[in-house]
């Protein structure tokens, strides 16, 4: 999806939500359909620990827009675009290679609960443990698929990865 990004990118950036927090369905935006489709119902008895989407106007090393996990006080519906700020990176890889996730929160004026979170170190350990557990196990029952979690990096690394992935205008 090619859209205008924020004027202060990568300090703040737009994320299209594909999967709401608490969902057991994996939805994906399909550019050729200009719509969100149901990719699959998760094979495991698990739900997404945060809202999941992608940063508009970016391309990661895998050729897809950068994945973003949006921590918020509410579940956000698929297709909604949220102005966010980066707080860190969850480094991981799957069966196809590097598959990092930018960690973000909505900007403070969108979700006031975000005001206390400035870096990944501000996320409570139990939430980081849930995120790690989810990504290490949600593909277990799917043949040939896996996800390996490597660790968390802070806000500066997230901003760097966003800047490097920005599509040329």
Curated annotation (Swiss-Prot):
Chain sites annotated for binding substrate: 26, 40, 52, 138
GO cellular component: cytoplasm
Catalytic activity: diphosphate + H2O = 2 phosphate + H(+)
UniProt signal peptide: none
Function: Catalyzes the hydrolysis of inorganic pyrophosphate (PPi) forming two phosphate ions.
Family under the similarity heading: Belongs to the PPase family.
Alphabetized HAMAP family for the sequence: Inorganic_PPase
Protein name: Inorganic pyrophosphatase
